[in-house]
């Protein structure tokens, strides 16, 4: 996956042949919530497509925690009981997968974690999209746009999810020492519907706002729709690299940034599992901290032939993309 590199300064590696096994392989995945939002749905599809494309993987078992910590604990136990050859985990919370990770490692099963940090470091490989970087890049955009002062709204994702926690932390770091104040904050759950409700509530309570920071997913597009619904100008806003947001941005020309957090991380985790089972030596920790997209890049990558639910970057084939998101 472009942009994924070994975490700077971290020299821990997984030795060659430590988890080497003859194929065919059975790989399991504990997903935090496939239906949480359109990004989570596509990340699952990216994972499944990557597994399907490798003939050495005979079975890919994806279990959906549906945002339940208790369900994730049970799912990981289930995958261990099924004697899968590797487990991929996207944690519901910073601690929801810790016990399961340690159980799997003790059973000799390598564990790949992505899309959220864990308290434990017993995992085999960690691939993180840099939540703090996401929040900081988008926060710094607002600092620059507002000249270091003004009132902003904050739309959180899932406040207990490690990715949202770190994105918010990055925002706070970006506005530290400035005269930017958070005057309204609530959780839009990374969804269009909840994001719309939160933004409309903010607007009706006090429409005077200088900028909007969003934790991403479908909330930014929803907030733009609220302003357009009331015939008001959209203030500087942060978004994510989603086809729907890019379309709104291009059509409106609003001052914005799209921060990248590709669902291709799902495929990257499958490739990491394959590398381990194939006996390759790889790093323990990887990081993915791309720059934000400007309007020029948005125009160059927007896909008018695909729906607003499509996220970038993606490793899905064009045939798969059109089957899933074609208009």
How would you describe each model-predicted region?
Residues 1-327:
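A residue-level marker of the well-folded mature domains of exported/periplasmic proteins
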């Amino acid at each position: 996956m472009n942009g994924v590199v070994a975490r700077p300064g971290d020299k821990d590696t997984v030795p060659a042949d430590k988890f080497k096994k003859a194929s065919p392989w059975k790989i399991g995945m504990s997903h935090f919530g496939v239906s949480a939002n359109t990004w989570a749905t596509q990340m699952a599809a990216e994972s499944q497509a990557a597994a399907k494309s490798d003939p050495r993987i005979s079975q890919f078992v994806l279990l959906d925690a549906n945002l339940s910590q208790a369900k994730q604990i049970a799912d990981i136990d289930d995958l261990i009981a099924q004697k899968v050859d590797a487990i991929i985990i996207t944690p519901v919370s910073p601690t929801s997968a810790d016990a399961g990770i340690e159980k799997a490692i003790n059973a000799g099963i390598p564990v790949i974690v992505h899309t959220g940090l864990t308290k434990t470091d017993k995992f085999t490989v960690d691939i993180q999209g840099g939540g703090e970087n996401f929040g900081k890049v988008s926060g710094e955009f607002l600092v620059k746009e507002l000249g270091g002062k003004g009132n902003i709204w904050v739309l959180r994702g899932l406040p207990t999810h490690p990715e949202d926690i770190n994105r918010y932390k990055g925002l706070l770091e970006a506005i530290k020492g400035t005269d930017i104040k958070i005057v309204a904050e609530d959780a839009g759950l990374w969804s269009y519907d909840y994001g719309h409700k939160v933004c409309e509530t903010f607007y009706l309570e006090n429409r005077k706002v200088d900028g909007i920071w969003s934790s991403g997913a479908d909330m930014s597009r929803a907030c733009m729709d609220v302003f357009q619904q009331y015939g008001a100008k959209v203030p500087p806003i942060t978004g994510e690299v989603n086809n729907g947001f890019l379309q709104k941005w291009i059509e409106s020309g609003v001052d914005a940034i799209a921060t990248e957090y590709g669902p291709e991380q799902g495929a990257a985790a499958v490739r990491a599992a394959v590398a381990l089972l194939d006996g390759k030596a790889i790093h323990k920790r990887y990081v993915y901290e791309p720059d934000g997209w400007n309007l020029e890049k948005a125009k160059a990558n927007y896909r008018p032939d695909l729906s607003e639910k499509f996220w970038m970057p993606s490793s899905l084939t064009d045939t798969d993309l059109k089957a899933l998101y074609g208009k």
